[in-house]
Structure formats: C-alpha cells, structure tokens
C-alpha cells in the first residue's frame, strides 16, 4: 500500500512538472500611455488587468501626461529592448519632430509588434507638414490616415466577412455595439492594411458612411494590430473590447 501511495505521489509530481513546463510563459508588454482628452489613469488598469486575465503578460507602464516627458523616455536608446510588444494608448497629436517619430517607427519596422488604440491614430502625424499623409512614417506604421471623429454616440461594429476567420478577430461576434462611442474618420486605408471590422454611427450622425475601426498591418518585420475604438471608459471596460485587444496581442506576438 505504501509503495502504491509513493508511486502515485511520484506520478503526480512528475505530471505537475510537465504541466508547469508547458504552461504559457508571460509575455513582456510595454504600455505607452498618457496625453490629453482621455482618462488614461483609469484605462491603463482596465487594459492591463483585462488582457492579463485572458493572456499572461508582465507589464511595464510608461505613463506621461506631458508630451515632453514621454518623448524623453521614447528617445532613450534601447527603450523597447526586452519587450514582446508595445501597446500605444496615448494622445500626442501636436508632436512635430519627424526624426523622433521616425525613430519610434523604426523599432517596429525592425520587428517589435505594436498594438494601437484610439488616439494613437491621431498622434505623431498631424503636425508633420512637409509630407503627404500616406508618406508619414507613423501613418504607414498604423496602416491608415485618420483625422477627426464623429459625435459621442454608440456605434455598431461589424466584422468584414472576408476576414471573419482572421486570428485577430475570429473569436469576436459578427456584430456588437459600443455602449458609448467616438467613431474616428479614416480618411485613407493604406496599401497592405487589412480592415477586419467597420464602425457605423447610423444615418443621423457623421461620418455618414461606415469607417474602418479594426485592422491589421505588417510594417517591415513588425506586426501591427490597431483599433480606433476606445474613447470612453465604459467602452474600454466591456468584454468585447478586452477580448478584441487580447486577440490582437495574441496575433501580433504569435501567441
């Protein structure tokens, strides 16, 4: 009896070791956040906790309301070293230092995956005046040119049937509605970008036509997942939004 008990204990111990060895190792994620017009203090916690409940991630946060502080940190050599992905939830629309912006883009062109939401689409390009929108490095990284938005009303998000089984969105419902919203104008979808879902404000609100609101892009060696959804805390806190950005992280990092 003792031999049987010892054998069962040993078998259980070995199984535990094997299970631990095959457990999903945490990704290392850098959340770059801060700036104007949004409750970034609240959203950073919701985003990190929401993703980590669905996918193991060890987070580092770079939270700066002052664009000069954020720029200083993102200008340091090797700022992205050791991270499996960088998540941008920030709003620094007035940045006009092209060399600085190009240096951030180079990090992802060289292979670091990028996740971007909402006002990241309005950051780092509007005040660059000597290039066409489609030529600006940040827009090329994001995969779209966006400027402006509609009113604060809920909107419907509908998957594109052609890409309904894309890994970054396949587990999402075919259609869902945001509790609150601020639908961004996507003035141009750049070559190579795959739009996975469109947002629709309805006929009474601008923009009158559905706008791309979830998409993926490949920029150099780096995968990019982006969504323009996410202005209000109520929307960022929904299961649908947290499921969506987690799927984006999984796709971009190969998890």
Roles of regions detected by a PLM:
Residues 5-16:
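Bacterial N-terminal signal peptides
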Residues 21-24, 28-32, 36-123:
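Helical hinge/lid and interdomain linker segments adjacent to catalytic or ligand-binding clefts
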Residues 21-27, 53-57, 202-212, 218-255:
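Extracellular ligand-binding/catalytic regions of CAZymes and related secreted enzymes
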Residues 32, 93-171:
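A glycine-rich, often tryptophan-bearing local segment used as a flexible ligand/cofactor-contacting loop or short
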Residues 34-37, 153-157, 173, 203, ...:
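Active-site rim elements
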Residues 52, 56-60, 71, 150-220:
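Catalytic beta-strand/loop cores that center a nucleophilic Ser/Cys/Thr
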Residues 113-115, 194, 223:
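Proline-centered loop/turn at the N-terminus of a beta-strand
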């Amino acid at each position: 009896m003792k031999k049987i008990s010892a054998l069962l204990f040993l078998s259980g111990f070995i199984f535990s070791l094997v299970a631990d060895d095959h457990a999903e190792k945490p990704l290392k994620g850098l959340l770059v956040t801060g700036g104007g017009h949004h409750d970034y203090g609240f959203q950073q916690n919701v985003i990190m906790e929401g993703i980590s409940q669905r996918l193991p991630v060890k987070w580092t946060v770079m939270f700066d309301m002052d664009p000069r502080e954020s720029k200083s940190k993102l200008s340091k050599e090797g700022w992205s070293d050791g991270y499996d992905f960088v998540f941008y939830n920030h709003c620094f629309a007035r940045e006009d230092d092209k060399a600085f912006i190009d240096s951030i883009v180079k990090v992802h062109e060289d292979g670091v995956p990028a996740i971007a939401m909402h006002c990241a689409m309005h950051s780092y390009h509007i005040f660059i005046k000597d290039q066409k929108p489609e030529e600006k490095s940040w827009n090329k990284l994001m995969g779209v040119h966006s400027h402006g938005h509609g009113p604060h009303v809920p909107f419907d998000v509908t998957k594109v049937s052609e890409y309904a089984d894309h890994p970054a969105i396949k587990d999402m419902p075919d259609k869902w509605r945001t509790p609150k919203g601020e639908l961004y104008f996507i003035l141009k979808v750049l070559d190579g970008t795959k739009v996975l879902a469109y947002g629709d404000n309805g006929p009474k609100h601008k923009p009158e036509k559905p706008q791309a609101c979830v998409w993926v892009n490949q920029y150099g060696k780096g995968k990019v997942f982006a969504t323009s959804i996410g202005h209000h805390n109520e929307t960022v806190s929904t299961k649908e939004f947290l499921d969506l950005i987690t799927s984006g992280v999984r796709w971009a990092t190969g998890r």
